[in-house]
UniProtKB/Swiss-Prot annotation:
EC number assigned by the record: 2.7.7.1, 2.7.7.18
Species of provenance: Pongo abelii
GO MF terms, alphabetically ordered: ATP binding; nicotinamide-nucleotide adenylyltransferase activity; nicotinate-nucleotide adenylyltransferase activity; protein ADP-ribosyltransferase-substrate adaptor activity
Keyword field: ATP-binding, Cell projection, Cytoplasm, Cytoplasmic vesicle, Golgi apparatus, Lipoprotein, Membrane, NAD, Nucleotide-binding, Nucleotidyltransferase, Palmitate, Pyridine nucleotide biosynthesis, Transferase, Ubl conjugation
Reactions that this protein is recorded to catalyse: beta-nicotinamide D-ribonucleotide + ATP + H(+) = diphosphate + NAD(+); nicotinate beta-D-ribonucleotide + ATP + H(+) = deamido-NAD(+) + diphosphate
Cofactor(s) needed by this chain: Mg(2+)
Functional pathway: Cofactor biosynthesis; NAD(+) biosynthesis; NAD(+) from nicotinamide D-ribonucleotide: step 1/1; Cofactor biosynthesis; NAD(+) biosynthesis; deamido-NAD(+) from nicotinate D-ribonucleotide: step 1/1
Predominant cellular place of this UniProt entry's protein: Golgi
Protein name, entry field: Nicotinamide/nicotinic acid mononucleotide adenylyltransferase 2
Regulation of protein activity: Inhibited by P1-(adenosine-5')-P3-(nicotinamide-riboside-5')-triphosphate (Np3AD) and P1-(adenosine-5')-P4-(nicotinamide-riboside-5')-tetraphosphate (Np4AD).
Subcellular location as annotated: Golgi apparatus membrane; Cytoplasmic vesicle membrane; Cytoplasm; Cell projection, Axon
Gene assigned in the entry: NMNAT2
Job description of the protein: Nicotinamide/nicotinate-nucleotide adenylyltransferase that acts as an axon maintenance factor. Axon survival factor required for the maintenance of healthy axons: acts by delaying Wallerian axon degeneration, an evolutionarily conserved process that drives the loss of damaged axons. Catalyzes the formation of NAD(+) from nicotinamide mononucleotide (NMN) and ATP. Can also use the deamidated form; nicotinic acid mononucleotide (NaMN) as substrate but with a lower efficiency. Cannot use triazofurin monophosphate (TrMP) as substrate. Also catalyzes the reverse reaction, i.e.
GO cellular component: axon; cytoplasmic vesicle membrane; cytosol; Golgi membrane; late endosome; synapse; trans-Golgi network
Length: 307
């Protein structure tokens, strides 16, 4: 497959990130490596989306702290960024709502075609008639006529500037879209782009708990978007999927990362990190990056047993 025919992917991880661990970052890296090795995908961005404060989980520190820790954890990454949208809403958002938000946002700011995990979308590029060739208006007539796929997620404002940082410098122009006044953006091309939910096997297993997830949401998450699962503690993902009719129905939409099942980061968790901090355990340096540890100590987080 050539670069232009591969499916382009953004990995989205939702969660408490209380705090964000080295395991979370490794989850992104392992998923990207695995998808690239299949020869069918190009991962062009990763998004960390911390949950809203009203989620109500015991010991959950404020989103202000969690967003800062997440930003510190990814500050050296050239493809993973932190998105505050979920935290900035008036109340807790479902995972399905977060996925739909980012899908709609990508449609607006990139103009590319987003599709379901199995069925390519026939939806026209936003702001363009279905039967007409898109005619962007250029401020600079010398823009390259064949942009690479990576350029679609170029700088469209500071809030999205880190979605895809692995891209060559290109000239910019003004794209006029009747549906979105976005100002200066990169030229786009029609490629297939999918947003996939990235999670551990513990979240996958939660789909099997009766009443925990709205079934309509599960249909959208697994059926329309798709999931990339990075197993933890050598979890049996086949057994997990067999316990849910929806997971069985859409098993082809669930990609399980099959690399080293004994990966050292697969046993790292936020819970272990909090306990290590509370007990002064030196192993915390194995769980959290140093900038995150420094921020936690400075802000006196997770010091008592209540979180």
């Amino acid at each position: 497959m050539t670069e232009t025919t591969k499916t382009h992917v953004i990995l989205l991880a939702c969660g408490s990130f209380n705090p964000i661990t080295k395991g979370h970052i490794q989850m992104f890296e392992r998923a990207r490596d695995y998808l690239h090795k299949t020869g069918r995908f190009i991962v062009i961005g990763g998004i960390v989306s911390p949950v809203h404060d009203s989620y109500g989980k015991q010991g959950l520190v404020s989103s202000r702290h969690r967003l800062i820790m997440c930003q510190l954890a990814v500050q050296n990454s050239d493809w993973i960024r932190v998105d505050p949208w979920e935290c900035y809403q008036d109340t807790w958002q479902t995972t399905c709502s977060v996925l739909e938000h980012h899908r709609d946002l990508m449609k607006r700011v990139t103009g590319c075609i987003l599709s379901n995990v199995n069925t390519p979308s026939m939806t026209p590029v936003i702001g363009q008639p279905q039967n007409e060739t898109p005619q962007p208006i250029y401020q600079n007539s010398n823009v390259p006529t064949k942009p690479t796929a990576a350029k679609i997620l170029g700088k469209v404002g500071e809030s999205l500037s880190r979605i895809c940082c692995v891209r060559p410098p290109v000239e910019r122009f003004t794209f006029v879209d009747e549906n979105a006044n976005l100002g200066t953006v990169m030229r786009y091309e029609e490629i297939e782009l999918r947003i996939l939910l990235l999670c551990g096997s513990d979240l996958l297993e939660s789909f099997c708990i009766p009443g925990l997830w709205n079934e309509a949401d599960m249909e959208v998450i697994v059926g329309d978007f798709g999931i990339v699962v990075v197993p933890r503690d050598a979890a049996d993902t086949d057994r997990i999927m067999n316990h849910s009719s929806i997971l069985r129905k859409y098993k082809n939409n669930i990609m399980v990362v099959k690399d080293d099942i004994n990966h050292p980061m697969s046993v790292v968790s936020s819970t272990k990190s909090r306990l290590a901090l509370q007990h002064g355990d030196g192993h915390v340096v194995d769980y959290l990056s140093q900038p995150v540890i420094d921020y936690i100590l400075k802000s006196q987080l997770y010091i008592n047993a209540s979180g």
